[in-house]
């Protein structure tokens, strides 16, 4: 059986780890352009 709850948590954790730096970079670029 596949444990979807664990898979969901791993995907969510990975998404947060990727989204964090991406948001920081986007904010830095927007501040740099202003």
Swiss-Prot record:
NCBIfam families: PRK13686.1. Its main location: plastid. A core subunit of photosystem II (PSII), probably helps stabilize the reaction center. One of its GO terms (cellular component) is chloroplast thylakoid membrane. GO terms for biological process: photosynthesis. It comes from Trieres chinensis. It is a single-pass membrane protein. The chain crosses the membrane at residues 6-26. The keyword Cell inner membrane does not apply. The keyword Signal does not apply. This is Photosystem II reaction center protein Psb30.
């Amino acid at each position: 059986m596949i444990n979807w709850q664990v898979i969901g948590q791993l995907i969510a954790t990975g998404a947060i780890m990727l989204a964090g730096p991406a948001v920081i970079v986007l904010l830095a670029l927007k501040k740099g352009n202003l």
